[in-house]
Regions:
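Bacterial N-terminal signal peptides
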Residues: 39-52
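Gly/Ser/Thr/Pro-enriched helix-cap/hinge segments flanking short amphipathic alpha-helices
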Residues: 56-58, 68, 78, 387, ...
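Blade-edge beta-strand/turn elements of extracellular beta-propeller
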Residues: 61-64, 135-144, 185-195, 265-277, ...
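Repeat-based blade/solenoid architectures
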Residues: 70-92, 142-155, 194-205, 251-252, ...
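Beta-propeller blade termini
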Residues: 90-100, 129, 150-165, 179, ...
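Hydrophobic beta-strand segments that make up the repeating blades of beta-propeller
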Residues: 103-110, 162-171, 217-221, 298-303, ...
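Short, conserved, GDST-rich strand-edge loop motifs in beta-rich repeat architectures
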Residues: 109-123, 223-251, 412-429
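Asp-box/WD-like beta-propeller blade repeats and closely related beta-sheet repeat scaffolds
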Residues: 139-156, 169-209, 219-249, 253-255, ...
Length: 585
């Protein structure tokens, strides 16, 4: 039985039970600062290693895939030799509780091959029902998930407000919208809803952009890429002296889509009339969050080899594109990057969401700190992410408190685009290891992945976090290219106290867009409920907090998408709680 919190009353559950004008530094100034901090980086990292939190000592990530039941999923996308760009984009993954039994399930998005796609494609996803102990059963066909094509990404949310969790799949050729019928069954309603477009979509995110009480949808679209006119390898498509597949540069991009929900199951694309993505950039990861604390959901789009997009929601139906003005469009040197995955968190607990996105090799991933005045400062090198990510091609990324010490850490998965990378010099590899950045406070991170048992190399794409075994720490699932996924159990991450907060709207739906604050020891942590994040993926919708040695949270508050608020005081830790939105009367 789920915990319930309403109007300040709470029933507790025990561990293991179910869930009850912007002023910012110029590019030259930021680059100068980066050069200064690089000279101090070696000494700083040594100091951080010495001061590494005792909370994370003994933390290990254990690969439990062979015993999980997930090994039957094949992440093959196209040919092994990767002749075309569509064959390397990979797929997303989601932790979700589709049957509301309190145990996390896993959804993996599947691609196809060009030959198979011409015959109708493969099943776009596979759904695995979890038993709470680490075993997952393939229920794809039983659940009615029969749409075929070339799957790419996933976003989760209750678009029809019936209290059951639905999901949206992006893909090449067509997208799919699955409505949850209950009793473990789904129906595909994309065409009926008006969102089964025939082109190449990658990222997606549900959010109530107009705050009318139902979930709208943003979709990032990539390339116009007809299979009967695929660009072939030639001398014009060259990377470090090797002929490689062509794209995306030189190929026509597609406008992103902004679908507004009419509340009756129909969506209308208003992107053109709202001047969304007029330049038709190469859209990949999408992250919806309230970056300026005005209670309206804003949009960040990580674009491939073109400027990123940052849409501020003005609350009147208009979105203002401010990427250049906010400092989120380019690298700290003013250069376009190959940006892919994205996440946001309040890394310094100042009440403002900071931004992180992954990039291609020789670019380093980007850590942008929110100044609270409508601008961001690039602290990639100053925070410990520059040198550590320089030779990696980053994809999935997720913030989370991996050791329950009350600071949000960061997990990044990698893998090069080109099989030819193994022939490059300068340390590049096709398969690459994963990175774990532990947050040591003062905006400082230390990469410790190998120390935590992550030395294997993969061609990884999608990444999601969630506590699948209900032991109070965050576990990891990764969708790999050309192979089975990886399920990592977090061992030792639950030494500190924890809390999982499940937020539910009046209709019983997961409260996508809700903001959750938890205060203990005079410090406040911030989380937001998001339908998607990372690279084409979705984390558990329940919000996880770590509290270190604390015994209770002084206060837990929720700001609902409707604008209402709920506040709980003196909350016992090491449990799952459900907070229900108060009625509107």
């Amino acid at each position: 039985m789920a915990d319930s919190v309403q109007a300040g009353r709470m029933r507790e559950s025990k561990p293991g039970e179910g869930p009850v004008a912007l002023s910012h530094p110029t590019f030259m100034q930021r680059n100068g600062r980066a050069r200064q901090v690089r000279s101090l980086l070696t000494g700083l990292l040594g100091l951080l290693a010495t001061l590494a939190s005792a909370q994370s000592q003994g933390l290990r990530f254990v690969d439990v895939t062979p015993a999980s039941g997930l090994e039957g999923f094949d992440g093959l996308q196209g040919s092994v030799s990767k002749q075309h760009i569509i064959e390397v984009m990979g797929g997303g993954v989601a932790f979700l509780d589709f049957d509301a039994d309190g145990r996390l399930d896993i959804l993996l998005v599947r691609g196809s091959t060009i030959e198979q796609f011409e015959r109708g494609g493969d099943l776009m996803c596979a759904l695995y029902r979890g038993d709470g102990s680490g075993s997952f059963e393939d229920v794809t066909l039983r659940a009615g998930l029969t749409a075929r094509g070339w799957g790419q990404g996933v976003a989760v949310g209750d678009f029809d407000s019936d209290g059951r969790l639905d999901f949206f799949l992006t893909g090449y050729g067509s997208n799919a919208l699955y409505r949850n019928l209950g009793q473990g069954r789904f129906e595909e309603v994309g065409r009926l809803a008006g969102i089964a477009r025939s082109h190449w979509s990658l990222g997606a995110s549900f959010a109530d952009f107009d705050r009318d009480g139902d979930l709208d949808l943003y979709v990032s679209n990539y390339l116009a890429y007809p299979l009967d006119r695929l660009p072939q390898r030639d001398a014009n498509c060259n990377y470090r002296g090797f002929d490689v597949f062509c794209g995306p540069r030189g190929l026509p991009g597609l406008r992103d889509s902004l679908y507004l929900n009419d509340g009756a199951g129909k969506f209308t694309d208003v992107a053109a009339e709202r001047s969304i993505d007029d330049d038709r950039l190469y859209g990949l990861g999408v992250l919806v969050a309230d970056y300026n604390n005005d209670s309206w959901p804003d949009i960040f789009v990580a674009n491939d080899l073109t400027a990123n997009l940052f849409y501020q929601n003005n609350g009147d139906g208009r979105f203002e594109e401010l990427a250049v003005l906010t400092g989120t469009a380019f690298s700290q040197d003013g250069v376009e990057e190959g940006s892919m995955g994205v996440d946001a968190a309040d890394i310094d607990r100042d009440g403002w969401l900071d931004l992180y996105y992954t990039n291609s090799s020789y670019e380093s991933n980007s850590m942008l700190v929110n100044n609270g005045d409508g601008s961001f400062t690039n602290l990639t090198y100053a925070s410990g992410h520059g040198e550590s990510t320089h030779l990696f091609v980053g994809w999935g990324v997720a913030f989370g408190d991996l050791d329950n010490d009350s600071r949000e850490d960061l997990f990044v998965v990698n893998g090069h685009l080109y099989p030819e990378a193994d022939r490059f010099e300068m340390g590049l590899r096709y398969e690459q290891r994963w990175l774990v950045f532990m947050n040591h406070g003062d905006r400082q991170f230390l990469e410790r992945g190998e120390e935590f048992g992550l030395s294997e190399r993969y061609k990884s794409r999608g990444l999601a976090l969630g506590d699948y075994d209900s032991d109070g720490d965050l576990d990891v699932v990764v969708n790999n290219l050309d192979g089975p996924p990886t399920l990592l159990r977090n061992d030792g991450g639950n030494r500190g106290a924890w809390l999982l907060v499940d937020t539910r709207t009046e209709s019983g739906s997961p409260a996508v867009g809700a903001r959750v604050l938890a205060t203990s020891g005079g410090s406040t942590q911030l989380r937001e409920v998001r339908s998607s994040a990372s690279y084409l993926s979705a984390n558990d919708l329940r919000q996880h907090f770590g509290f270190g040695p604390d015994a209770r949270a002084e206060q837990v508050s929720v700001r609902w998408p409707s604008g209402r608020t709920s506040t709980l005081s003196d909350v016992e830790l090491n449990q799952v709680i459900t907070v229900e939105e108060p009625d509107g009367e």
